[in-house]
Design a protein with these regions (language model features):
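A membrane-topology feature that recognizes alpha-helical transmembrane segments
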Residues: 1-346
C-alpha cells in the first residue's frame, strides 16, 4: 500500500508540473505577443523548424564536448544564465511595472529583473529539487510560450515530428543522450524535473551516490528516467528480460523527467491557441478547442509514458508526448470546423 501511494504521488506530481507548464504557456501567449516577443518574422515558414533542429544538434554536440573535456562548470553557468533570461521574459509580462525605471529611453521593470536574478541565485546556491522544479515550470512555460507564438501550425508540427524521431534515435539507437544525461545529473540544473518518491528525499544529498552510476536518459531534450535505472542490466539484458531481473522502481527515491518532454509538446498547444482559427473557450487565457485537445493528447501520452517508465526502464519521451500533442490538436482542429488543409497550416 505504501509503495502504491508513493507511485501515485509521483505520477500526480509529474502530471501537475506538466499541466502547470502548459497552462502557464497558454497564459503567456497573448502577453508575449503584445510585448513583441515573437522570435521570427514569418512564423509560417517551415524552414524555422529546420533551423531550430539544427540548433538542437549543435547545442547537443557542444554539451557533449563540454562533458568530454570535463569543464561542466561552463554548462552549469550557461544554463543558470539562460534560466535567468527566460525567467525575465516571463516576469516582465506578469509583474506590474510600477517600479519601472527608464534606461536609454526604454522602461525597465525592476521587479522582473529582481525576480529573475533571484531565480538564478537560488539555482546557484541552493539547487534543491523544489528549486529545480519551480524554475523548470517557469522557464518551461516561458520557452513554450515564446516558441508557440513563433512557430505556426505547420512549422510546429514539423518541429515536433522531427524531434520525436531524433529522440527515439538518440535514446534507443546511438544512445548519445545517455552520455549527456549522465553528464548533467550531477550539475543540479533545471534541465530535468525531479520527482521525489519519498518526503525525505534531498536532491542535494543524493549527489554522486545515486547519479554517478546512472546510465538512463534524463536530458534537456527528451527522455524519461528513474534515479538509478540503466537501459540494460550489467549482463546485457534488454527490454524482454524477465521482470525479476529489472530494477524495482519502488526502491528509488526519485524519478527524473527531461524538461524538454514538457516544453516541446506544449509548443504545439501554444501554437494551436495562437494560430488556429477557432473560437476561444474561456476568457483570460489563450485556449480554444484545438489547444485543449492538444493538451489532453499530451497528457494521454504522458500517462502511457509514465506507465512504461514505472515498469523500471528508461524510455524516450517525445515520440509519445509529441505524438499525443499533434494527434490531439488535429482532432480538435477538425472538430472545430477547420479543414485538414487549414489544420496543417497549408
Amino acid at each position: 500500500m505504501e509503495d502504491r501511494t508513493r507511485l501515485l504521488g509521483a505520477v500526480g506530481l509529474t502530471v501537475a508540473m506538466f499541466l502547470l507548464v502548459q497552462l502557464g504557456a497558454l497564459a503567456l501567449v497573448e502577453p508575449f505577443q503584445r510585448a513583441g516577443y515573437q522570435q521570427v518574422e514569418n512564423p509560417s515558414d517551415p524552414t524555422n523548424s529546420l533551423l531550430y533542429v539544427g540548433a538542437v544538434l549543435v547545442l547537443t554536440a557542444a554539451m557533449l564536448a563540454i562533458i568530454k573535456l570535463d569543464v561542466q562548470w561552463l554548462l552549469r553557468g550557461g544554463i543558470i544564465l539562460t534560466s535567468g533570461l527566460l525567467s525575465w521574459y516571463v516576469f516582465s509580462v506578469v509583474m506590474p511595472a510600477g517600479l519601472a525605471v527608464t534606461v536609454d529611453g526604454a522602461a525597465v521593470n525592476v521587479l522582473a529583473i529582481g525576480a529573475a536574478l533571484a531565480v538564478s541565485v537560488a539555482l546557484l546556491v541552493h539547487p534543491e529539487w523544489y528549486v529545480i522544479d519551480a524554475t523548470g515550470v517557469i522557464i518551461g512555460a516561458g520557452a513554450a510560450g515564446l516558441f508557440g507564438i513563433s512557430f505556426g501550425l505547420l512549422p510546429a508540427i514539423l518541429l515536433l515530428g522531427v524531434l520525436a524521431i531524433y529522440d527515439a534515435i538518440s535514446v534507443y539507437g546511438t544512445e548519445h543522450m545517455l552520455t549527456l544525461a549522465s553528464g548533467v545529473m550531477d550539475l543540479k540544473i533545471p534541465v530535468v524535473f525531479v520527482v521525489p518518491m519519498t518526503l525525505s528525499y534531498s536532491y542535494l544529498d543524493a549527489g554522486d551516490d545515486s547519479d554517478g552510476d546512472d546510465d538512463g536518459p534524463a536530458d534537456t531534450e527528451s527522455s524519461v528516467d528513474d534515479a538509478e535505472d540503466a537501459v540494460a542490466n550489467p549482463d546485457g539484458a534488454d527490454a524482454d528480460h524477465p521482470e525479476a531481473e529489472r530494477p524495482d522502481i519502488t526502491d528509488r527515491d526519485a524519478i527524473f523527467i527531461g524538461l524538454g518532454d514538457a516544453v516541446m509538446p506544449t509548443v504545439m498547444v501554444a501554437s494551436a491557441a495562437f494560430f488556429a482559427e477557432a473560437e476561444p473557450l474561456v476568457s483570460g487565457i489563450a485556449l480554444n478547442l484545438p489547444a485543449l485537445t492538444s493538451l489532453l493528447g499530451t497528457m494521454a501520452g504522458l500517462l502511457v509514458l509514465l506507465w512504461m517508465v514505472l515498469k523500471g526502464r528508461a524510455h524516450a519521451g517525445l515520440p509519445l508526448l509529441n505524438g499525443g500533442a499533434i494527434g490531439g490538436y488535429l482532432i480538435g482542429a477538425l472538430a472545430s470546423g477547420l479543414t485538414l488543409t487549414q489544420a496543417l497550416g497549408l
